[in-house]
């Protein structure tokens, strides 16, 4: 029975692989439950990736500023060691007195998002869960440690479960605060461990044990069933920190758990995650573009958020290429999603409530793009959708045209439910005449072939 399920799911997921680009290193899972969950995840299309932590207090670029690499920009006149100590000291200031995960979940539900990924620990090592293996956690360090909701991850996951989101835990494999990763005995020249493992094997052994223990805390049931384990920090592989020892128990607790050991390739990267970019063509396996709503992953005081129109256009392109969009939105230092972001997200959600049929539960089609138009298909292939991505600063034209994907009968405009005619020219070009009175937003069309 398991072999038959596995074969069916593999065929369903790869049935149009010949139409798409290939990526080196992707390995399809062999666990039928993982394949089944991947298929369900591919129905969702739109999720949120939340970065929150010490870096949110001053509103800087996540924890990267404590990494001593040439591309990092720190305040003029600051020393590296002085800056690092200042950053660690933010653990005494992190005090999200307005922490409201229910508000987060409501905002993202209103946006039409269907899955979430939350940073339990970024590279700086500061844990947003109550870890037994370090004191560098919100539950033990700083003023929020006395708050009854100090085990932040628990409340975040629970809030999103009530909204039927798929639940994802982000976890950084590198931990710059841990003495077994960045030893205080040596300088820290870059993001990697700052000692030679062959000279200090016990240090590395201690780090592997520490990481396995923390992963066990997150995946072992204390935080409920998880759908996605999203592992960041690709300069260390999951294999190096005992991931293969953790996963069997994690999947016993959370059957079908999707593991994303990102950028590593191989059997534990169940879907791939291009960052701040979209692949040029369709891909032949599950993938997600993780992209920010503003310029940065965490909250900043001057975010320069993308418009709802731009996010919708991006989502249409990603969906037509077979992927999902994890949109980065960071909570404020006080613990809410700011209204400036919520307004944009609600506008996206209003469009998806009317036009989401062209996005959710769809699969790719051979002719997937013509200019500003992105095509998707229903799972059975009997219905096609065309999303006209309306570029910034442009108005809707009275008609839109494409080649191929010739409609059979009338075309439904999902934005307002009206049916319109489509004409086919001698050269095979399809022209659809848009009804008057449409809002200036991307247009989604539905038709049969």
Please state what every model-predicted region is.
Residues 1-4, 108:
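Positively charged n-region of N-terminal signal peptides that target proteins for export
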Residues 5-7, 123:
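N-terminal targeting/docking segments
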Residues 7-8, 49:
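General helical structural elements
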Residues 8-15:
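Bacterial N-terminal signal peptides
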Residues 17-19:
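Short, composition-biased linear "edge" segments at structural boundaries
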Residues 22-449:
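Mature catalytic domains of secreted/periplasmic carbohydrate-active enzymes
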